[in-house]
C-alpha cells in the first residue's frame, strides 16, 4: 500500500515554511495524541504518520532528500520504521501546550517572587486633602540575614538535585508520548539543601515586623492605592520581593462631604435671613470665610466657592466648596414672637399668601384642581 505524501498528512503546501509545519503538527498531534484517544488504533496510527512526517519535513537534509526522491529516500532503513524515537524536539513543540495538561513545562522552576502585601490606612479628610507622612508597622517575611536567602548553612551551598540533574524536570513516558513533569525530589528548583540554615531552617526567609514611613500625596480619596515597590514579602531563595499596597480609606467628616475634588456642606440659616438676605460665616478646610446670602433665598440653594475644594492628586485645578442652604423653622418661640409671626402671616394674606409665597400658591392651586377634577 502506497504511503501518503508527508505534506498531505500535515495539510501544508510543498513550499511551507518551518513555522507553518510546526503549527500544523501541533494542531494534529493534539487531536490524535494516544492519551486523548485511548484504545483508538486508528488515532494511534494517524499519530505515528503525523510524527514521521514532522520529523522529515523539519530536518532540512531529510526534507531535501524527500523532495527529490520521495519515500524511496528512506526505504533502506533511514527512518527506522516509526516509533517515538528520533530527533523531534517535543519540548519546543509541546512545552507550552502539554506542560499544563500533564503537569510539566519547560526548564527549571524559578524561585517564587515574594507575595504582595496590603495595608489598610484610615485617614481624616484633612490628611487626605493636604497629604501626610505616616509610619506603619507590618508583619512580613524578610530575607534571612544569616544565609542571605539561600537557605543553606553559611559555608555551604545548595547541591544539584541528583534526580533531575539541576533541570527541575523529569521525563515520564506515557504510552507513545514522553512528557516532562516537575521533579518530585526538588520541587522544580533543581537544587537541594543538604545543610539548612539554623535560623530559617532552609526556607531562606524569616518572619519579622518592619516599620515603614509612607508618604501620602495630597488629594487622595477612598479606594486610592499607593504602591511601595519591593516592600512586600521577600522572594524565595533570592527571588525578587513583592510589593506593598497601601489602601486608602477616608473617614466620614462631621461637616464636609466629598465628591471627586469638590466638597459639600450644609449651611443652616433662619427664615428672616433667608427672606431679607445677609452675610454669614461658613467653614472651609482653611478656616472660616464670609458668604453673602441674597434675599428670598430658598432651601436647597447652592453657593459655589471656587478653589476651596480639594486639589487633584494628579495635579491641575483645585475643586470647589458648594454650600447648600437649609432654611430652619424657628422653635421654642415665646408669646411675643408667636404674635409677630401671626401678624406676619396675616399680612401675607393667610397661609397661602399669593404674593409673598408663590410656590405655596402654586401648590394649593394644584391641590384644588385635583379635587375639583375628582368631583366632576
UniProtKB/Swiss-Prot annotation:
One of its GO terms (biological process) is DNA replication. Zn(2+) 2 binds at residues 161, 164, 183, 186. It is found in: Cytoplasm. Pfam families: DnaJ, DnaJ_C, DnaJ_CXXCXGXG. Binds 2 Zn(2+) ions per monomer. Keywords: Chaperone, Cytoplasm, DNA replication, Metal-binding, Repeat, Stress response, Zinc, Zinc-finger. One of its GO terms (molecular function) is ATP binding. Its cofactor is Zn(2+). GO terms for cellular component: cytoplasm. A zinc finger (CR-type) spans 131-209. Residues 5-70 form the J domain. The J domain is necessary and sufficient to stimulate DnaK ATPase activity. Zinc center 1 plays an important role in the autonomous, DnaK-independent chaperone activity of DnaJ. Zinc center 2 is essential for interaction with DnaK and for DnaJ activity. Homodimer. Belongs to the DnaJ family. NCBIfam families: DnaJ_bact, PRK10767.1. This is Chaperone protein DnaJ. It comes from Escherichia coli O6:H1 (strain CFT073 / ATCC 700928 / UPEC). The gene is dnaJ.
Amino acid at each position: 500500500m502506497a504511503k501518503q505524501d508527508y505534506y498531505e498528512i500535515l495539510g501544508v503546501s510543498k513550499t511551507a515554511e518551518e513555522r507553518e509545519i510546526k503549527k500544523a503538527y501541533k494542531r494534529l498531534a493534539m487531536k490524535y495524541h494516544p492519551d486523548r484517544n485511548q484504545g483508538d488504533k486508528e488515532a494511534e496510527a494517524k499519530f505515528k504518520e503525523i510524527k514521521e512526517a514532522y520529523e522529515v519535513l523539519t530536518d532540512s537534509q531529510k526534507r531535501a532528500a524527500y523532495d527529490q526522491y520521495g519515500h524511496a529516500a528512506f526505504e533502506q532503513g533511514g527512518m527506522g520504521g516509526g516509533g517515538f524515537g528520533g530527533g523531534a524536539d517535543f519540548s519546543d513543540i509541546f512545552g507550552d501546550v502539554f506542560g499544563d495538561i500533564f503537569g510539566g513545562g519547560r526548564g527549571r522552576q524559578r524561585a517564587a517572587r515574594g507575595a504582595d502585601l496590603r495595608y489598610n490606612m484610615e485617614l481624616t479628610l484633612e490628611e487626605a486633602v493636604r497629604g501626610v507622612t505616616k509610619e506603619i508597622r507590618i508583619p512580613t517575611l524578610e530575607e534571612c540575614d544569616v544565609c542571605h536567602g539561600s537557605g543553606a548553612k553559611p559555608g555551604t551551598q545548595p547541591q544539584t538535585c541528583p534526580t533531575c540533574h539541576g533541570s527541575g524536570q523529569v521525563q515520564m513516558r506515557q504510552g507513545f508520548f514522553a512528557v516532562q513533569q516537575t521533579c518530585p525530589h526538588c520541587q522544580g528548583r533543581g537544587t537541594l539543601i543538604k545543610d539548612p540554615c539554623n535560623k530559617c531552617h532552609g526556607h531562606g526567609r524569616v518572619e519579622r515586623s518592619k516599620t515603614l514611613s509612607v508618604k501620602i500625596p495630597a488629594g487622595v480619596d477612598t479606594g486610592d492605592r499607593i504602591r511601595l515597590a519591593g516592600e512586600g514579602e521577600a522572594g524565595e531563595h533570592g527571588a525578587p520581593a513583592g510589593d506593598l499596597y497601601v489602601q486608602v480609606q477616608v473617614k466620614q467628616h462631621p461637616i464636609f462631604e466629598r465628591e471627586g475634588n469638590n466638597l459639600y456642606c450644609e449651611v443652616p440659616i433662619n427664615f428672616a435671613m433667608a427672606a431679607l438676605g445677609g452675610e454669614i460665616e461658613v467653614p472651609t478646610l482653611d478656616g472660616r470665610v464670609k458668604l453673602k446670602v441674597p434675599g428670598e433665598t430658598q432651601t436647597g440653594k447652592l453657593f459655589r466657592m471656587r478653589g476651596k475644594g480639594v486639589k487633584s492628586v494628579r495635579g491641575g485645578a483645585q475643586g470647589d466648596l458648594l454650600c447648600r442652604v437649609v432654611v430652619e423653622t424657628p422653635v421654642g418661640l415665646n408669646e411675643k414672637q408667636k404674635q409677630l409671626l401671626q401678624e406676619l402671616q396675616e399680612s401675607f394674606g393667610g397661609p397661602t399668601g399669593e404674593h409673598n409665597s408663590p410656590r405655596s400658591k402654586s401648590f394649593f392651586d394644584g391641590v384644588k384642581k385635583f379635587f375639583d377634577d375628582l368631583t366632576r
